[in-house]
């Protein structure tokens, strides 16, 4: 057997995930299939690439060597694809996003902003996957979020702009919750609640929540990890969990949204693109489309409109 690009991608994904099970999920294959593939790869490389332990896998010395070469090869292949695409004037622009409120409005606005260039959109549940695919040339542009002080590392050849510098996360809970009648919530009042997070919270969100809750005197129970929007809403409406939520989120039957006193958890929204695939003018148009999509949702909740009006520093900066 000879090593192929898919083998190098599998090795990189295992290193990123830290476990075979999680890497298999991200690759869309079964764990036994990935384990068998790794054994074949190790037979070619001449030794174990990962040391297996109780808490996952870590690259061996040989693994670090193979990973360094694999990332270089994959980067060069990504650059080749991006440069070739840039030469093809009619190539569609590939946009990758995580589940953000502005997404629905962004889709319509990108078609208007980039009239004459087809735009394809894919939704991912992981910021890590978005960034990796952007660096690999599988996306030309990505829209993602960061929480509190966490900064997502970006690959070479990528430029990023901040669409929204700051937004205060609020709480979505059942309309029958004991605190649903309150106008504002203190985080300490939510000790003992069951919290829901996304499957891939690699934007700093869980760390920010745990830190904020620790300051409020408790450790949150991050029990539910669900990426399907409707299922999340159904569980919250049933009183099974509460969740951090963007303040621009629209109303959902059976639930209410309440701001947190002191805004202990804040987020920001960013747009990043491959310079070799996206001309500066198109990047500017995409940025403005993302800003417009966000602003269209500011009035979804009265409490956020009041906060927005009182915090001009949180507004997008347009050149």
Protein language model annotation of sequence segments:
Residues 1, 248-254, 262-319:
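C-terminal effector-binding regulatory domain of bacterial HTH transcription factors
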Residues 12-30:
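Short helix-boundary/capping micro-motifs
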Residues 31-32, 72, 79-135, 143-147, ...:
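N-terminal winged-helix
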Residues 39-59:
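A short LG(V/I)-centered, amphipathic sequence patch enriched
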Residues 102-106, 183, 193-216, 280-283, ...:
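Secondary-structure junction motif
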Residues 127-130, 135-138, 145, 199-256, ...:
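Hydrophobic hinge/microswitch elements
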Residues 153-161, 167, 230-278:
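Beta-alpha-beta core module
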């Amino acid at each position: 057997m000879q090593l192929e690009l898919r083998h190098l991608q599998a090795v990189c994904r295992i290193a990123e995930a830290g476990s075979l099970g999680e890497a298999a999920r991200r690759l869309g294959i079964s764990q036994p299939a990935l384990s068998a593939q790794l054994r074949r790869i190790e037979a070619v490389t001449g030794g174990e690439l990962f040391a297996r332990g109780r808490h996952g896998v870590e690259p061996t010395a040989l693994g670090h060597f193979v990973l360094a070469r694999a990332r270089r090869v994959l980067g060069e292949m990504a650059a080749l694809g991006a440069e070739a695409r840039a030469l093809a004037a009619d190539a569609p622009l590939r946009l990758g996003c995580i589940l953000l409120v502005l997404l629905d409005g962004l889709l319509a606005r990108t078609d208007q902003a980039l009239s004459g260039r087809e735009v394809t959109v894919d939704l991912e549940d992981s910021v890590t996957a978005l960034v990796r695919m952007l660096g690999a040339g599988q996306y030309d542009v990505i829209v993602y979020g960061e929480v509190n002080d966490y900064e997502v590392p970006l690959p070479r050849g990528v430029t990023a702009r901040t669409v929204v510098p700051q937004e205060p996360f609020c709480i979505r809970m059942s309309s029958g919750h004991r605190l649903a009648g309150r106008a504002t919530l203190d985080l300490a009042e939510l000790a003992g609640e069951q919290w829901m997070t996304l499957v891939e919270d690699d934007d700093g969100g869980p760390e920010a929540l745990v830190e904020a809750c620790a300051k409020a005197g408790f450790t949150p129970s991050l029990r539910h990890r669900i990426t399907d929007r409707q299922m999340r809403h159904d569980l919250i409406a049933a009183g099974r969990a509460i969740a951090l939520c963007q303040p621009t989120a629209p109303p959902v039957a059976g639930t209410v949204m309440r701001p947190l006193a002191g805004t202990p958890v804040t987020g920001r929204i960013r747009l990043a693109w491959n310079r070799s695939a996206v001309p500066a003018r198109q990047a500017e148009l995409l940025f403005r489309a993302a800003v417009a999509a966000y602003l269209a949702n500011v009035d979804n909740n009265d409490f956020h409109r009041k906060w927005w009006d009182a915090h001009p520093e949180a507004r997008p900066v347009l050149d």
